[in-house]
A protein has these predicted regions:
Chain B
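Two-component/phosphorelay signaling modules centered on CheY-like receiver
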Residues: 8, 13-38
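Hydrophobic/aromatic residues positioned on beta-strands within the core alpha/beta folds
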Residues: 89-90
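C-terminal output helix
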Residues: 115-124, 128
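Receiver (REC) domain active-site loop signature in two-component systems and cognate sites
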Residues: 65
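Helix N-cap/capping motif at the beta->alpha junctions
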Residues: 20, 35-48, 70
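Short amphipathic alpha-helix used as the core "switch/output" element in two-component signaling
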Residues: 44, 71-83
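Active-site beta3 strand of CheY-like receiver
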Residues: 7, 50-60
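Alpha4 helix (beta4-alpha4-beta5 surface) of REC/receiver domains from two-component response regulators
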Residues: 72, 93-109
Length: 470, 135
């Protein structure tokens, strides 16, 4: 019992015992009472009978049997009922004791109450489990959020696109309508020529033929088309001259002369028209010239439609590789203006202050289109479709500065800090997702650019973006 | 006999030119054709023609134009010239605007772009017969 005193001083957690080869206890230290609640004498009657029937103890009994034969065992654990009925986990270290002859005389053991340690370990394990579960939940939530975010970005794009489509429908239906009508006009003119060709070739007088050929040569193809106001001015002027010259049906003759771009040549034309049935000659010329006039109209309509389609194609163009490319910022911005043309023309004056020497910049052009789309669309909305939209592009050598200024309602001071927050919107439900400006900021950051704005309520807002050239 | 006129209002010259020629082709020299590029000019034209004792019978107006929209324009026309037949011709159907024009301008018909000459002819002819029936 070398360390008896030492061990007894550790009474709160340890007790010490020894038993002979028959299992009779020779000694149990008094701290057994502190730990298990049994008096020393009571404990000496045997601790094994207080063991619970746990799986752990079944193994422990095997270890105890081996230990009792003098075979040195590693530290082992078992569970015991205390006197009060609670369960304690005891860790045992036993060692055999031999006499000089080498005979086993007793087994000495140190019992360590590790109940609290086990409980702590259990708690830690449980907490670890919980943490692991929470981490998994968080990961799932993040994945969900990412998914939601990309859906929102998508729906923001779709909303912007939806806005555009309504306008684009108008922008495309207009030239198609014009083309359709022009084709109809050409067909009718040709039908009319064919119906009258015999008369024209055989029945007209020499004078009428001369008038026909002279006027045919006079048609002013190079004259620019008149706007409606000018047309009305010339109509009055020409009609008055025709009236004074004593013509009948001056409304019809006037219309033909305007149609043939002869609106400035009335004085020369009047003597030529002093023939029998001038309307027939003019009508014939009209029908021939109609093919050219309507073809020109179709050409203009096609150009208009192509411009819209091109802009639309660029807008929805998705570059899967997502590599930066050298792009022309002016074209990039003007394309967005084309797409918003139908909204702009309702009452917005666009001022374009572009420096002449803007270099191509290395960027993601499709993403920048989204930036301009958002900012221009917001500006139009802020101005309630009436006001001045000023777009400035400055060459600052290493960087290009773009500013988009409106004369709209402005952004109240108290929400200045909020406008880039996701889901913040001042628009009515359904009009905006509240991530437009967040998207703008992200795209600018991706370009290592800079975004600032100035705003005064009632005066307007200016967004200024600088982008590196390289 | 008093001259009769059909007036078209659209901010696109390609429409005014092709539509005007088409109307002339359909209706011949019996009617004058006048055009205007916006609502303000449209009203000016109607007033001018009226002053010249020309009877404006039909007005065909676009909806989406700079300045005043088609429905507001037709309502204004209706207030000053209730007898004129009002037709809207536009590439973008705005239901609210159409209903507004039906309710407040007695809109005769709505044609969407692109239109067919048959539709245009039918709409204008039914409009004209309305006037004749009223005397």
């Amino acid at each position: 019992m070398k360390y008896k005193q030492l061990i007894e001083s550790l009474g709160n957690e340890y007790f010490f015992y020894s038993h002979n080869i028959n299992g009779d206890y020779l000694y149990i230290s008094p701290s057994v009472k502190t730990i298990l609640g049994y008096e020393v004498e009571e404990a000496k009657l045997g601790l094994v009978k207080h063991m619970t029937d746990s799986e752990l103890n079944k193994k422990t009994i095997e270890v105890l049997k081996k230990s009792a034969t003098g075979e040195k065992q590693k530290t082992f654990q078992f569970e015991l009922f205390t006197k009060s009925g609670s369960i304690k986990v005891i860790e045992i270290t036993e060692s055999p004791l031999y006499n000089e002859k080498g005979e086993l005389i007793s087994i000495e053991g140190v019992a360590h109450d590790i109940t609290r340690r086990i409980e702590r370990e259990k708690t830690i394990k449980e907490q670890n489990e919980k943490l692991k579960q929470q981490t998994e939940e968080l990961e799932a939530t993040i994945a969900d959020l990412k998914q939601t975010q990309s859906q929102l970005v998508q729906s923001e794009k779709m909303r912007a696109l939806g806005n555009l489509i309504a306008g684009v429908a108008h922008e495309i239906n207009t030239p198609i309508g014009a083309i359709n009508a022009s084709i109809d006009n050409i067909s009718r003119s040709l039908d009319d020529i064919l119906a009258n060709i015999y008369t024209l070739f055989t029945q007209i007088s020499e004078q009428q033929l001369l008038a026909f050929l002279t006027l045919l040569k006079m048609i002013r193809r190079d004259k620019p088309p008149l706007i409606s106001k000018e047309k009305r001015y010339y109509k009055k002027l020409v009609k008055e001259k025709l009236d004074n010259a004593g013509f009948e049906d001056t409304y019809t003759i006037t219309d033909h002369l305007i149609y043939l771009n002869l609106y400035e040549d009335a004085d020369q034309v009047i003597p030529i028209l002093q023939i029998e049935d001038p309307v027939f000659i003019l009508k014939s010329l009209h029908n021939i010239y109609s093919v050219r006039k309507n073809s020109e109209n179709i050409k203009m309509a096609v150009e208009k439609a192509s411009k819209v389609v091109y802009a639309l194609k660029r807008f929805t163009h998705k570059d899967q590789g997502m590599a930066k490319e050298l792009s022309n910022l002016k074209e990039n911005i003007d394309m967005v203006l084309t797409l918003h043309h139908n909204r702009i023309k309702q009452g917005i004056e666009v001022v374009q202050n572009y420096d002449d020497n803007i270099p191509l910049i290395n960027c993601y052009p499709d993403e920048l289109v989204q930036v301009w789309t958002n900012l221009i669309s917001n500006a139009i909305q802020a101005m309630d479709n009436t006001g001045q939209l000023t777009i400035t592009i400055r060459n600052l050598q290493e960087r290009i500065q773009v500013s988009i200024a409106d004369t709209g309602c402005g952004i109240p001071e108290e929400i200045h800090e909020k406008i880039f927050e996701p889901f913040f919107t001042t628009k009515k439900a359904g009009e905006g997702t509240g991530i437009g400006l967040e998207l703008v900021l992200k795209i600018i950051e991706k370009h290592q650019g800079n975004l600032e704005f100035e705003s005064k309520v009632g005066e307007g807002t200016t967004f200024t973006i600088t982008l590196p050239v390289n | 006999m008093k001259k009769k006129a059909i007036v078209c209002v659209d901010d696109e010259s390609i429409i005014l030119d092709s539509l005007g020629e088409q109307i002339k082709n359909i209706f011949g020299d019996e009617y004058l054709y006048e055009s205007a590029e916006n609502a303000e000019e449209g009203l000016e034209v109607i007033e001018e023609l009226t002053k010249e004792e020309i009877d404006v019978l039909v007005i065909v107006s676009d909806w989406l134009m700079p300045g005043k929209k088609g429905d507001e324009f037709l309502i204004e026309v209706h207030k000053k010239f209730p007898r004129i037949i009002k037709v809207m011709l536009t590439g973008q159907a705005d239901e609210v605007a159409i209903n507004n024009a039906i309710k407040n301008a007695e809109l005769h018909a709505y044609i969407s772009k692109p239109w067919s000459s048959e539709d245009l002819e039918r709409v204008i002819k039914t409009g004209l017969s309305k006037i004749e029936n009223k005397g």
